UniProtKB/Swiss-Prot annotation:
Enzyme Commission designation: 2.3.1.74
Assigned keywords, A-Z: Acyltransferase, Flavonoid biosynthesis, Transferase
Record's function text: The primary product of this enzyme is 4,2',4',6'-tetrahydroxychalcone (also termed naringenin-chalcone or chalcone) which can under specific conditions spontaneously isomerize into naringenin.
PROSITE patterns: CHALCONE_SYNTH
Pathway in which the depicted protein is active: Secondary metabolite biosynthesis; flavonoid biosynthesis
Name under which the protein is recorded: Chalcone synthase B
Domain of life per record: Eukaryota
Pfam families: Chal_sti_synt_C, Chal_sti_synt_N
GO biological process, one term: polyketide biosynthetic process
Residues the record marks as active site: 170
Catalytic activity: (E)-4-coumaroyl-CoA + 3 malonyl-CoA + 3 H(+) = 2',4,4',6'-tetrahydroxychalcone + 3 CO2 + 4 CoA
Amino acid sequence: MCTTVTVLTDTWSRREKRFEGHAKILAIGTATPANWVDQTTYPDFYFRITNSQHLLDHKEKFRRICNKSKIRKRHMILTEELLKKNPNLCTYNDASLNTRQDILVSEVPKLGKEAAMKAIKEWGRPISEITHLVFCTTSGVDMPGADFQLTKLLGLNSSVKRLMMYQQGCNAGAAMLRLAKDVAENNKGARVLVVCSEVMLSVFRGPSLQQEDNLLAQCLFGDGSAALIVGTDPRPGLETPLFELISAAQTIIPNTDSHLKLHVREMGLTFHCSKAVPTFITQNVEDCLVKAFEPYGISDWNSIFWVLHPGGNAIVDGVEETLGLAPEKLRASRDVLSGYGNLTSACVLFILDEVRKKSKKDE
């Protein structure tokens, strides 16, 4: 692989490369594995497949967590056959990183391809017109990365400009929108393929009496991929803009870094989430909104449409109550959480797709 960077004067750059208007989402595609689990029966499956049926109190606690999650089902590549073939995935702390990596490095790009093909089909333009690829996943760090593998799977031009983002978790979905906006608006004529592909095999493991937040991870996450085509200046009659990306911002809430952590270990990706996370979000969400929307004169949070990442039901409930949102404002977020679980980076793009579908129905 060869990367070449040409540096021009600022005057030339402004004349030749700048956009004519804000970036727009021109197509959306989503995909999930065919295999899925029913949340009501999942505790029985989970404790059986991990040989943990003797942990009766722990199993009942897990059942309560699942019942409160407001999740109906989740799609997963994990099947009973795969888990029986790889028993080291079913313990809590056996060394299993190699096993997980072998599966993830293959499955993440393949699932991403499914969503990308749907987005490209909706876009309706030749795949050769894609100029940039930005890809993110929480799992399966490898080199060449999932972006390179997807380039081959799709048959993209060898000159396509790629950016790979690993292990940014739920934050990555919105971050990808920001990156795609920046790329599209600073490269005249660019058509950016955005792909978020998540296979949460990395956090699957058996129960631990000492690490109770592990049960939350086993209850919450699902597999899925989402893809967008983003560009400026849609060609009339050839491209149909769905959403316009006006601005993007990111804020760090002070003193919160110890409350939500994922670490790569020999046992896979460990998950640690304190009970304070929903409170931190609800206490700070309005300040973030004020900073983002004040330049546009928007202060009525019910006057805008919402694509809230549903990190969990408590977060959705807390934001709705804190901001006084009407129930329908977060309906798309609740529907995606219910039907798919937390899809980490792909989640907000699934919700964006739900919002667009509902908008079409209401026309």
